[in-house]
């Protein structure tokens, strides 16, 4: 069932070892966690909108998300401190590999005009962040039952020390990159 976990253990570790020649097996980069964040700006006007976002993120990730609160009040956005403004979920271990597999095999091919990810999305420490504009690219979301199309930010946190190691690791999982 967890093909990506087996792929990492059987092929990707071996390829990383050949390319970067690590002295210790604990130096080999791995994916630590995947964080999915969904900001809901409309929640300032209607507090029920956040529940729909939580339901969508639960279906996508298979895990109940945490509702995020505003840290401080901002009058121009009509935002008060401790107001619900989004939700996030952190995936680790088997759920992380399951989500990554569904993302690469099912969701990304359904994104319109998707050419791949830019290498500029790495943060310099081996972590990779990108955004999706629609939650409907995941088959778990029923288009007829959603109230509005929402995007999400996805961060893949790795133990890689450099972006080059992280790029090689994520390319092993068939994440499409360009340039």
Curated annotation (Swiss-Prot):
User: Mind telling me which GO cellular component terms the entry cites?
Assistant: ribonucleoprotein complex; ribosome
* Classification via Pfam families: Ribosomal_L5, Ribosomal_L5_C
InterPro entries listed in its UniProt record: Ribosomal_uL5, Ribosomal_uL5_bac-type, Ribosomal_uL5_C, Ribosomal_uL5_CS, Ribosomal_uL5_dom_sf, Ribosomal_uL5_N
GO terms assigned for molecular function = rRNA binding; structural constituent of ribosome; tRNA binding
- Which processes are annotated in GO (biological process)? translation
Top-rank taxon, per record: Bacteria
Instruction: Tell me if DNA-binding is a UniProt keyword of this record.
Output: no
Q: Which UniProt keywords apply?
A: Ribonucleoprotein, Ribosomal protein, RNA-binding, rRNA-binding, tRNA-binding
Similarity-based family = Belongs to the universal ribosomal protein uL5 family.
Q: Summarize the subunit comment.
A: Part of the 50S ribosomal subunit; part of the 5S rRNA/L5/L18/L25 subcomplex. Contacts the 5S rRNA and the P site tRNA. Forms a bridge to the 30S subunit in the 70S ribosome.
User: Which HAMAP family does UniProt cross-reference here?
Assistant: Ribosomal_uL5_B
* Chain's role: This is one of the proteins that bind and probably mediate the attachment of the 5S RNA into the large ribosomal subunit, where it forms part of the central protuberance. In the 70S ribosome it contacts protein S13 of the 30S subunit (bridge B1b), connecting the 2 subunits; this bridge is implicated in subunit movement. Contacts the P site tRNA; the 5S rRNA and some of its associated proteins might help stabilize positioning of ribosome-bound tRNAs.
- Its name, as the record gives it, is Large ribosomal subunit protein uL5
Which organism does this record belong to?
Answer: Rickettsia africae (strain ESF-5)
Q: What is the lineage of its organism?
A: Bacteria, Pseudomonadati, Pseudomonadota, Alphaproteobacteria, Rickettsiales
């Amino acid at each position: 069932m967890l093909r990506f976990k087996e792929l990492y253990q059987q092929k990707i570790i071996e390829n990383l070892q050949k390319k970067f020649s690590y002295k210790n097996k604990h130096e080999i980069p791995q994916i630590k966690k995947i964080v999915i964040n969904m900001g809901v700006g409309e929640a300032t006007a209607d507090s029920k909108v956040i529940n729909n976002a939580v339901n969508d993120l639960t279906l996508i990730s298979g895990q109940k998300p945490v509702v995020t609160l505003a840290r401080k009040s901002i009058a121009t956005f009509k935002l008060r401190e401790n107001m619900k403004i989004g939700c996030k979920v952190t995936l680790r271990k088997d759920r992380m590999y399951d989500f990554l597999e569904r993302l690469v095999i099912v969701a990304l091919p359904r994104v319109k005009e998707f050419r791949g990810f830019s290498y500029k999305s790495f943060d310099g420490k081996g972590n990779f962040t990108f955004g999706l504009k629609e939650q409907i690219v995941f088959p778990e979301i029923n288009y007829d039952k959603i109230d509005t199309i929402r995007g999400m930010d996805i961060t893949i946190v790795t133990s890689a020390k450099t972006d080059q190691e992280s790029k090689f690791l994520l390319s092993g999982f068939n994440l499409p990159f360009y340039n």
